[in-house]
C-alpha cells in the first residue's frame, strides 16, 4: 500500500466514523473534508457503502474518485486496493468500479455508475466476485444528496 492510499484510508476512516454515529439505514448522507466529498449509505447490519469524489487531481490532472465498503468489523475495502475488484449490481446491471480513472473505459464506467446509482432503490456490492452486501436506498433522498457526473467525474 502506498502513502497516497494510506492517506485516503485515514481520511476515509475519520469521515466514516462521523457518518456511522448518525447513519439511518437506507438514507444517503454527505460529508466533506480535505478536498473530498463523500456520500454514504448504511444497511441494517451496519455495513456502509461510500462514494468518494475527490477535488484533488493526481499528478496527471485526473480525479481519482473511488468507492469504499466498510464491513461490520470496520474492515474497509476500497476500489483503489491492489488486487481488489468492486462491482455494484443495480437494476439487473453490473457496474465494475474502475481501480483508476483517466482512461476512456474507466471514465465511461465511472460516469455510468454515478448516473445510475442515483436511481437505484436497491443495489448489491460484490468484492472479488463475492457478494459483500445489499443496500436499499430512497431514490428521492439519493436525487437530493448524491453527486451528478459533473460533480464527480473527469470532464
What function would you assign to each model-found segment?
Residues 1-10:
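Bacterial N-terminal signal peptides that target proteins for export
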Residues 18-20:
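N-terminal signal peptide c-region/cleavage motif recognized by signal peptidases
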Residues 22-155:
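A generic "folded-domain core" signal
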Amino acid at each position: 500500500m502506498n502513502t497516497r492510499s494510506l492517506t485516503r484510508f485515514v481520511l476515509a476512516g475519520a469521515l466514516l466514523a462521523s457518518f456511522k454515529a448518525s447513519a439511518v439505514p437506507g438514507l444517503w448522507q454527505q460529508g466533506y473534508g480535505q478536498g473530498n466529498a463523500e456520500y454514504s449509505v448504511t444497511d441494517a447490519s451496519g455495513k456502509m457503502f461510500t462514494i468518494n469524489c475527490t477535488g484533488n487531481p493526481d499528478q496527471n490532472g485526473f480525479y481519482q474518485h473511488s468507492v469504499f465498503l466498510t464491513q461490520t468489523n470496520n474492515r474497509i475495502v476500497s476500489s483503489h486496493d491492489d488486487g481488489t475488484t468492486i462491482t455494484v449490481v443495480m437494476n439487473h446491471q453490473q457496474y465494475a468500479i474502475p481501480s483508476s480513472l483517466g482512461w476512456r473505459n474507466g471514465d465511461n464506467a465511472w460516469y455510468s455508475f454515478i448516473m445510475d446509482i442515483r436511481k437505484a432503490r436497491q443495489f448489491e456490492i460484490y468484492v472479488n466476485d463475492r457478494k459483500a452486501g445489499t443496500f436499499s436506498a430512497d431514490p428521492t433522498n439519493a436525487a437530493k444528496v448524491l453527486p451528478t457526473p459533473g460533480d464527480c467525474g473527469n470532464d
